[in-house]
Amino acid sequence: DRWHRVMGEAVVLPTLGAQLKRRTLEWEGLEEPPTVGHGNDPGGEGPFQQGGEAEAHRYLQSFFAGRVKGYRRNIGQPLASRRTCSRLSPYLAWGCLSMRQVFHAFRQAPKQGATHDLRAFGSRLRWQGHFIQKFESEDRMEFEPVNRAYLEQGHTGTPESLRAWKEGRTGVPLVDACMRCVIATGYLNFRMRAMLVSFLTHHLDHPWDAGVEHLARCFLDFEPGIHYAQFQMQAAVTGINTIRIYNPVKQGLERDAEGAFVRHWVPEIAHLQAPEIHHPWTIPPMQR
């Protein structure tokens, strides 16, 4: 179709004349220029990924060279996905890579042992373009629900529960681990992002726009065209999409079976074993 045809066209590279001089910024009042937080290998639990085109290509190459194997299997797991997902979204959002560059690398990637993983990844490249184009024609979704009937919906969420959600201290282990993780690193896999929105809107009963800006500030890969549409879909205010209510305990048992992710980000309960670490309130007082 047209998307594949356009993405398959040659990558246009700028022609830089020899007369172009390198320019540097003057850091007034500073002995040393500020540095970007030190990056880490894909899958690490350190600070934010480093910016820049060179880092973008390092992630691009390492993904198709081997990390892609396991992409489909691990995409829903908060810990394993940190390595087997591409981690290219920040570089696309900030313009360090173009979608066409990624698409060309995808088409040239070796298929051996990764056919299904590559197919799953390729489908998501197209969805990225779909949501951005949709936002261009319906940009009001930044401010109001797609289905305006939800403007009249009442909510019972309290300021205290909203604050607890934003700070990662709701008392629900996987929810708190996910929020603390995204605050500290700027990254979280899709399913866990969806669960955070679901928990805010369905379990705590807050309107979708109570948390949309908070997560936008947290995401290193914030992309308006994707963020607002996905937030509304998970909050079930589009009126056309299936309503999905994520059970955070079930998600923890299925996606973080040994509790390693929760144990890392919620050290207060790191001493607990699985499966109790995902529902500590069920532990009898004598065993706590």
Would you name each region that the model predicts?
Residues 1-149, 255-256, 260-288:
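Glycine/tryptophan-enriched, flexible segments
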Residues 84-275:
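Active-site-proximal binding-pocket segments
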